[in-house]
Curated annotation (Swiss-Prot):
Functional description taken from the UniProt entry: Required for rescue of stalled ribosomes mediated by trans-translation. Binds to transfer-messenger RNA (tmRNA), required for stable association of tmRNA with ribosomes. tmRNA and SmpB together mimic tRNA shape, replacing the anticodon stem-loop with SmpB. tmRNA is encoded by the ssrA gene; the 2 termini fold to resemble tRNA(Ala) and it encodes a 'tag peptide', a short internal open reading frame. During trans-translation Ala-aminoacylated tmRNA acts like a tRNA, entering the A-site of stalled ribosomes, displacing the stalled mRNA.
Name under which the protein is recorded: SsrA-binding protein
Location relative to the cell: Cytoplasm
Family statement drawn from the similarity comment of this UniProt entry: Belongs to the SmpB family.
GO terms of molecular function: RNA binding
GO cellular component: cytosol
Domain of life (superkingdom): Bacteria
Length: 154
């Protein structure tokens, strides 16, 4: 039997990362979560804006991503909103990332968080930080594209 097309529901998108970094490659990673975190993600209470990923001891860790506490749960059973979460990737992907991050000085940034079927996934971007003039150039290019699209409509 053919495998059904998996449904993808984007929960949070980090648009700021595409402005601050030049994204060279993207990777998909699973994420190790607690029960209340999954419920909070389903409600869309995630902020990826300040997040980044670190490589420690052959594992990938997601830092500084804010998942709000689940409001229908008691305080005792809830999670810490900014706790460090382990990302689940294949060993060969992690080894490849270690080489690129350490040698080339690149950064791992979460681009979006989504449900793939019933699993929570994080799209990680391997990026290089943009300088100020690169950011200005991006803004100019975006404005020019908007102007051209507006002119083509007429």
């Amino acid at each position: 039997m053919a495998k059904e097309k998996e449904r993808i529901k984007v929960v949070s998108d980090n648009r700021q990362a595409r402005f601050l970094y030049e994204i060279l490659e993207t990777y998909e990673a699973g994420i190790e979560l607690q029960g209340t975190e999954v419920k909070s993600i389903r409600a869309g209470k995630v902020n990826l804006r300040d997040g980044f990923a670190l490589l420690r001891d052959g594992e990938v860790w997601l830092m500084n991503v804010h998942i709000s506490p689940y409001d229908k749960s008691s305080l005792f059973f809830n999670h810490d909103p900014r706790r460090t979460r382990r990302l689940l990737m294949h060993n060969w992907e992690i080894r490849k990332l270690i080489g690129q991050v350490e040698q080339k000085g690149l950064t791992l940034v979460p681009l979006k968080m989504y449900f793939k079927g019933s699993w929570v996934k994080v799209a990680l971007g391997l990026g290089k930080g943009k300088k100020l003039h690169d950011k200005r150039e991006t803004l100019k290019r975006r404005q020019d594209d908007r102007d051209m699209a507006r002119a083509m409509k007429r």
